[in-house]
Amino acid sequence: MDRIIDTAATREDEAIEVSIRPKRLADYLGQQPVREQMDIYIQATKARAEALDHVLIFGPPGLGKTTLSHVIAYELGVKLRVTSGPVIEKAGDLAALLTNLQPYDVLFIDEIHRLSPVVEEVLYPAMEDFQIDIMIGEGPAARSIKIDLPPFTLIGATTRTGLLTAPLRDRFGIVQRLEFYSPEDLARIVRRSAGILNIDCTTEGAAEIAQRARGTPRIANRLLRRVRDYAEVKAGGQITIEVAQAAMQMLKVDQGGFDELDRRLLHTIVEYFDGGPVGIESLAASLSEERGTLEDVVEPYLIQQGFLVRTARGRMATDKAYQHLALQPRERVSAFTDPEDLF
């Protein structure tokens, strides 16, 4: 399912993100508490001439976890090795990565929650003691040898902290949560990206794009590129607030950052299920969408923004959802009086 406001990175996103990615913490806009903390940790680490403690970065997709790892490595003045949990299939794959690190290098593992238990077992002593155990030979002749590793920093990124095992989670000395960005910070990001990409974008135009970007830089930059296309064809190339609004109308992204699927979901709960509660299976059937799509792609932002709530009996639209749909809230059944589980 292709959505302009999807947080998953496309190939175009990945190519563009490389060119607009900030290098220094000073250029990493937003996430002020994270920036301030990491600045202190990095300065202290460099003063002691040590490896930075292992870092876990978590939060919704598209908020800059990979970008932050690049910034950390740059500020430390070391190389960054990038991989992901699904790519490291065997213990030998991880051993090859670790033994090729130089002192104080940073190893970034995206989707670290998807590491297999066998690979995790190899990672534990590497993180704690900078050592790994390798099996040499097969059968009765097999034996284990220890290999010393140079001091290094592991940065793990995940959108699903609940799937991390406790032993792995406990081995990270620094844990950072990335939050959704404010419209003001997103507008600054849009203006910065526009400057790098040579896009003529007014301050008001950038603010209009930021307002509809769902608190996510990846979406903001994607919307910027699509609005640029519209501006070049329809408005002489300049993105003003009027051009941005017209482009968003064409893209069917409203002022709340909702697309057709978001509005359909809220409208279905309100119109067909009297505002809820409604079980996820019934909702998925009504929308002809997969349950996983609704749970992982559509609902998180609606819940975070207060348009939808999950209860023991199912999903309920809030008064805020009624207001967004320009409808009058109805008298609804309490979601907490009946223990029936509709999940």
UniProtKB/Swiss-Prot annotation:
ATP binds at residues 20-21, 62, 65-67, 128-130, 171, 181, 218. GO terms for biological process: DNA recombination; DNA repair. Residues 255-343 are annotated as: Head domain (RuvB-H). GO terms for molecular function: ATP binding; ATP hydrolysis activity; four-way junction DNA binding; four-way junction helicase activity. The keyword Hydrolase applies. Its EC number is 3.6.4.-. HAMAP family: DNA_HJ_migration_RuvB. The RuvA-RuvB-RuvC complex processes Holliday junction (HJ) DNA during genetic recombination and DNA repair, while the RuvA-RuvB complex plays an important role in the rescue of blocked DNA replication forks via replication fork reversal (RFR). RuvA specifically binds to HJ cruciform DNA, conferring on it an open structure. The RuvB hexamer acts as an ATP-dependent pump, pulling dsDNA into and through the RuvAB complex. RuvB forms 2 homohexamers on either side of HJ DNA bound by 1 or 2 RuvA tetramers; 4 subunits per hexamer contact DNA at a time. Homohexamer. Forms an RuvA(8)-RuvB(12)-Holliday junction (HJ) complex. HJ DNA is sandwiched between 2 RuvA tetramers; dsDNA enters through RuvA and exits via RuvB. An RuvB hexamer assembles on each DNA strand where it exits the tetramer. Each RuvB hexamer is contacted by two RuvA subunits (via domain III) on 2 adjacent RuvB subunits; this complex drives branch migration. In the full resolvosome a probable DNA-RuvA(4)-RuvB(12)-RuvC(2) complex forms which resolves the HJ. NCBIfam families: PRK00080.1, ruvB. This is Holliday junction branch migration complex subunit RuvB. The lineage of its organism: Bacteria, Pseudomonadati, Pseudomonadota, Gammaproteobacteria, Lysobacterales.
